[in-house]
A protein has these predicted regions:
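A nucleotide-sugar donor-handling region in carbohydrate enzymes
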Residues: 2-9, 131-205, 229-232, 329, ...
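Active-site donor-nucleotide binding/catalytic segment of nucleotide-sugar enzymes
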Residues: 12-13, 18-34, 117, 122-125, ...
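Active-site and donor-binding regions of nucleotide-sugar-utilizing enzymes
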Residues: 25-176
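Catalytic donor nucleotide-activated moiety binding site of glycosyltransferases and closely related
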Residues: 55-67, 218-254
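Short acidic-hydrophobic, aromatic-tinged amphipathic segments that line or gate anion-handling sites
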Residues: 72-77, 252-256, 319-327
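Catalytic binding pocket for nucleotide-activated donors in carbohydrate/polymer assembly enzymes
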Residues: 132, 160, 274-355
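C-terminal alpha-helical cap of glycosyltransferases
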Residues: 360-384
Length: 384
């Protein structure tokens, strides 16, 4: 049945969608990635008259049932590689790395590929070597990514990529939601700690999950555990073990979905390892992070060739405190230190955000302007 739905999508996008309405195509692997596009989509709809297409590989993606006349939604999964190879549009927007490095290839047609980041991490340690080689434009989050990509181009003679000083729309959405919370400065409610690690090997949940939750609950902290979606998919036993251990504890909550940011907004402190959520949480809620000192999340063994310290590494001592796993028995002291010095950390976080994030509050407009400029240039070329 799913495959039939894919064939119908292919037919609809090729033969039933006017060329002007497939000039721009967004692609998403999973429904959760819509949160990285929504600001850009809203800004684009206000400046681009024609509808555009949104392709998802998640059959349960709510966008497939959208009634928005400005978006044509399609489902492609197994047939996606074929679609990608022959897609004919002006601009293709995606948050998936490694285009043209594996089974998803650039189109045989002259398509301009725009990359949108789904994390604020640096480009050279958490991503594979060459992950951004085959995009025409990259909407950079901050100056650190521009420096890294420029340095990478110098070392390897990568093709000419437009590095757009855009910003990070998801961060702005988190900050806007947090700013509207009436309880954001309420000290009377129980302290809440969010544990949200990465899914890499040696992550916090795998090594110290039950021990960490038990130590926090014994100190009367409310605890929310938010496993990475890849952890739920690859290591479901970790979540199951936590649920079984603390199911009778009303102060424990296991959050299996990342559809909302509610847990981030309600947490007084975030505990993580090398996950990109640390930057989103700190810069979005202006609250500190407690980092667990576990091995780095390295997907590119050559990252040191750039001689640039990854942003997520340089920020660890600035956005909070780094704690060794052997110090879990002192977890309450670390959390209380962060909470008691919240204003000092807030001032520092706001300063660092202004120094390291482009166009805070206006990134979606910048991204939409870039796409519209590409469409304008393409139209001029076609008319000549």
């Amino acid at each position: 049945m799913a495959l039939i739905k894919e064939f119908v999508s292919l037919w609809r996008i090729r033969f039933r969608t006017p060329k002007s309405e497939r000039a721009v195509i967004f692609y998403s692997e999973h429904e959760s990635y819509f949160s990285y596009f929504d600001g850009l989509i809203d800004a684009l709809k206000s400046t681009h008259a024609d509808p555009f297409c949104y392709v998802t590989s998640d059959i349960n993606d709510p966008i497939l049932t959208t009634e928005d006349p400005g978006i044509h939604a399609f489902y492609l999964h197994k047939l996606l590689p074929i679609f990608m190879q022959f897609v004919n549009c002006r601009v293709f927007v995606m948050t998936l790395t490694d285009l043209n490095n594996f089974h998803l290839r650039r189109s045989i047609n002259p398509v301009h590929y725009v990359y949108v980041f789904h994390a604020m991490n640096s480009t050279h340690m958490a991503y594979r070597h060459g992950a951004f080689d085959h995009y025409d434009s990259i909407l950079c989050t901050g100056p650190y990514q521009v420096r890294e990509l420029q340095r990478d181009s110098e070392l390897r003679t990568v093709g000419n990529r437009q590095l757009v000083e855009a910003g990070y729309s998801r961060l702005e959405r988190i900050h806007a939601a947090w700013s509207e919370r009436p309880d954001k400065n309420d000290d009377s409610t129980p302290r809440t700690v969010l544990i949200a690690p990465s899914w890499a090997a040696s992550n916090v949940l795998e090594k110290h999950g039950i021990e960490l939750v038990a130590a926090l609950r014994s100190a009367d902290f409310e605890v929310i555990v938010r496993p990475h979606p890849e952890t739920n998919k690859r290591y479901p036993e970790l979540s199951t073990g936590l649920q079984e251990a603390f199911s009778a504890d009303a102060g424990f909550q296991l959050e299996r979905s990342v559809r909302t940011d509610d847990s981030m907004l309600s947490a007084d402190v975030l505990i993580t390892d090398w996950s990109g959520i640390a930057l989103e949480y700190a810069f979005g809620t202006e609250r500190p992070v407690l980092y667990m000192d576990v091995p780095r999340k390295v997907h590119n063994d050559r990252y040191e060739e750039l001689h640039i310290e990854p942003f997520e590494a340089s920020m660890r001592g600035e956005l909070g405190i780094v704690m060794a796993p052997e110090q879990i028995d002192r977890i309450a002291d670390f959390v209380n230190e962060l909470v008691n010095n919240r204003q000092r950390f807030r001032d520092q976080i706001v300063r660092l955000r202004s120094e390291n994030v482009f166009n805070f509050g206006h990134s979606s407009e910048i991204g939409a302007q870039h796409i519209c400029k590409l469409l304008s240039c393409d139209t001029q070329l076609q008319s000549n």
